[in-house]
């Protein structure tokens, strides 16, 4: 007779969870930030709001975003005028779009990740799907399983309505799944489409306007597993530890509410200030066990909520400008894609490191940190270890 302890030991992996492949996807429709204010005020029939348009232009100029991708085209918006109003009942139209498009965009990214991984998709044991764009039953996890033709016995986890910190959450969850189930291969997908949040401008709700200037669509997928098969699977980053916390005195700092008018966002407090004031505590808790206290000795992947957050974090921690290069690059090329952002940044970092001939996937460094920030105010902190290139 075997003991429970023996069974338990046999069920667990030996090494740490590792990212084995990354894939990303965006809708085809690309919008230049410099042209967006004119387009946005025209399509929402708001051109008479000249002062507000000037304010929006300034927001777009300061956003550090060059371009974004959006499922919503001019044609779609003309067919759905309620999406262009500030507060018109429009949830049905929004939902009809996202319940189809979110899994579809997720499939695009997942297909790329599976191809890079190079293993048969029948070896995928778990699916973790995350989106803040719409809800449905069965969920986007089920739709993705069907679209990809995964085994019906694949173990699924669906995360809805988490917001911008959730790129860290999916890594934390996938780490536990991979390390506690020997041989597990977890397909992680974050897919975000702004069709739930797009709306016309309003003079009194400027935080909504901030969202219109920042948010973009995108999907990212990872394959995560422990104990990579030598010569077959190629690890890119190891997941060493993961933590989540709610920042003190931050109630209502970022809120999202799903209502008849779609998903509305409210930024009620000094979000960049709250994050920069508390970030060192999270770093100390994560890196003290490793004996690391020089934040410039790490490679950095931070959710780019907006340029002000990055500027204040950089200033507070005295980070060298190049530390947030990959983060700023993704913000500039794609905008804020909510949960998918940090996964795009992981992809950008390992790509650039290979291109520049650096010795590791983490800008030549050994240890790194990934931060997710979002509603709560919630912070996810993931400690990463790079892999030699």
Swiss-Prot record:
Report the GO molecular function annotations.
naringenin-chalcone synthase activity
- Give the EC number: 2.3.1.74
Question: What keywords appear on the UniProt entry?
Answer: Acyltransferase, Cytoplasm, Flavonoid biosynthesis, Transferase
Per its record, the protein catalyses: (E)-4-coumaroyl-CoA + 3 malonyl-CoA + 3 H(+) = 2',4,4',6'-tetrahydroxychalcone + 3 CO2 + 4 CoA
Q: Which PROSITE patterns match?
A: CHALCONE_SYNTH
Q: Which domain of life is it from?
A: Eukaryota
| Compartment annotation | Cytoplasm
Per UniProt, what is one Pfam family of this protein?
Chal_sti_synt_C
Q: Which InterPro entries match?
A: Chalcone/stilbene_synt_C (IPR012328), Chalcone/stilbene_synt_N (IPR001099), Chalcone/stilbene_synthase_AS (IPR018088), Polyketide_synthase_type-III (IPR011141), Thiolase-like (IPR016039)
Q: What class of enzyme is it?
A: transferase
What is the predominant subcellular site recorded for this chain? cytoplasm
- Active-site annotation: 164
One cellular-component annotation, GO: cytoplasm
Instruction: Give GO terms for biological process.
Output: flavonoid biosynthetic process; polyketide biosynthetic process
Give the pathway annotation. Secondary metabolite biosynthesis; flavonoid biosynthesis
Its family?
A: Belongs to the thiolase-like superfamily. Chalcone/stilbene synthases family.
- Give a short account of what the protein does: Involved in the biosynthesis of prenylated phenolics natural products which contribute to the bitter taste of beer and display broad biological activities. Chalcone synthase that can use 4-coumaroyl-CoA to produce 4,2',4',6'-tetrahydroxychalcone (also termed naringenin-chalcone or chalcone) which can, under specific conditions, spontaneously isomerize into naringenin.
Q: What is this protein called?
A: Chalcone synthase H2
According to its UniProt entry, this protein's organism is Humulus lupulus (European hop)
Task: Give me the gene this protein comes from.
Answer: chs_H1-1539
């Amino acid at each position: 007779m075997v003991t429970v302890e023996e069974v338990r030991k046999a069920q667990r992996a030996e090494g740490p969870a590792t990212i084995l492949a990354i894939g990303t996807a965006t809708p085809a429709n690309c919008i230049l930030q410099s042209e967006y204010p004119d387009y946005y005020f025209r399509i929402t029939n708001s051109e008479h709001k000249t002062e507000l348009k000037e304010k929006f232009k300034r927001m777009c100029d300061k956003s550090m975003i060059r371009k974004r991708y959006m499922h919503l085209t001019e044609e779609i918006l003309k067919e759905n005028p309620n999406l262009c109003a500030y507060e018109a009942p429009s949830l049905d139209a929004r939902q009809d779009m996202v319940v189809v498009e979110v899994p579809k965009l997720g499939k695009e990214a997942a297909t790329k990740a599976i191809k890079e991984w190079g293993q048969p998709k029948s070896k995928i044991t778990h699916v973790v799907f995350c989106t803040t764009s719409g809800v449905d039953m069965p969920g986007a996890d089920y739709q993705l399983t069907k679209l990809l033709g995964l085994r019906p016995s694949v173990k699924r986890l669906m995360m809805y309505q988490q917001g911008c910190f959730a790129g860290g959450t999916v890594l934390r969850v996938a780490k536990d799944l991979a390390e506690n189930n020997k041989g597990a291969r977890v397909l992680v997908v974050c897919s975000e489409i702004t069709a739930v949040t797009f709306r016309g401008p309003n003079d009194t709700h400027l935080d909504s306007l901030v969202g219109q200037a920042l948010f973009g669509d995108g999907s990212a997928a990872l394959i995560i597993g422990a104990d990579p098969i030598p010569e077959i699977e190629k690890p890119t980053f190891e997941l060493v530890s993961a933590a989540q916390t709610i920042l003190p005195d931050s109630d209502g700092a970022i809120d999202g509410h799903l209502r008849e008018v779609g998903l509305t966002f409210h930024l009620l407090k000094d979000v960049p200030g709250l994050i920069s004031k508390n970030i060192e505590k999270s770093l100390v808790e994560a890196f003290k066990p490793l004996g690391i206290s020089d934040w410039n000795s790490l490679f950095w992947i931070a959710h780019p909520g907006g340029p002000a957050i990055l500027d204040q974090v950089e200033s507070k921690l005295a980070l060298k400008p190049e530390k947030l290069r990959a983060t700023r690059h993704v913000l500039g090329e794609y905008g804020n894609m909510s949960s998918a952002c940090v996964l795009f940044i992981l992809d950008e970092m390992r790509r650039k490191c290979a291109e520049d001939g650096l010795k590791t996937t983490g800008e030549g460094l050994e240890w790194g940190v990934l931060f997710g920030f979002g509603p709560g105010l919630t912070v996810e902190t993931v400690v990463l270890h790079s892999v030699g290139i």
